């Protein structure tokens, strides 16, 4: 388990978050700080019709990730589907934390951009976030082990 302070992608807030973490660090390294891009419950239709953003989801996520990197953050929360394009453009050291992870036979519920743990690995996710797949399982520990093994390869 990892704990990352997160901020919604706004340049001034992101820079302030880094400054605060630097000023308050108690050891040699400050905690990692990541920003949130587009939630995995959003898709292109929501972007176009509800948020009125006239661009592709991939371009929006990459732009927000670029803003986060330029502000000095360590990474972003994004769909596994955008992880590879982020790493291709911003480098593998830039962290992608990817929710929306489901096993192949799971319901996607309200999520629109989901992948399996193995696909998240192939798409270069740095870390995965798994919720309902484990918490809704009849055997959460066995499900956790399966997810872990699938992600590790």
Which functions belong to the PLM regions below?
Residues 59-86:
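Internal active-site segments that recognize and position negatively charged phosphoryl groups
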Residues 32-61, 85-127, 139:
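Active-site-adjacent loop and "lid" segments of alpha/beta metabolic enzymes
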Residues 68, 86, 120, 131, ...:
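Conserved, mostly hydrophobic/aromatic
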Residues 14-20, 121, 134-153:
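C-terminal helical cap(s) of enzyme catalytic domains, especially alpha/beta-barrels
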Residues 10-35, 45-46, 53, 65, ...:
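Non-catalytic structural scaffold of enzyme domains
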Residues 14, 65, 83, 117-118:
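Generic hydrophobic/aromatic pocket-lining and core-packing "Φ" positions
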Residues 77, 128-129:
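Conserved beta-strand positions in the central sheet of alpha/beta enzyme cores
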């Amino acid at each position: 388990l990892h704990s990352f302070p997160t901020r919604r992608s706004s340049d001034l807030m992101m820079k302030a978050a880094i400054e605060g973490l630097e000023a308050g660090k108690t050891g040699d390294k400050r905690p990692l700080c990541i920003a949130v891009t587009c939630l995995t419950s959003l898709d292109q239709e929501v972007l176009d019709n509800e948020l009125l953003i006239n661009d592709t989801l991939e371009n929006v996520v990459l732009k927000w990730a670029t803003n986060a990197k330029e502000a000095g953050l360590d990474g972003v929360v994004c769909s596994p589907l955008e992880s590879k394009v982020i790493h291709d453009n911003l480098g593998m050291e830039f962290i992608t934390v990817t929710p929306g992870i489901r096993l192949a036979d799971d319901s996607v519920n309200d999520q629109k951009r989901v992948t399996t743990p193995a696909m998240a690995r192939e798409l270069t996710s740095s870390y995965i976030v798994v919720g309902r797949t484990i918490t809704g399982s009849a055997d959460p520990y066995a499900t956790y082990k399966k997810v872990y093994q699938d992600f590790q390869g």
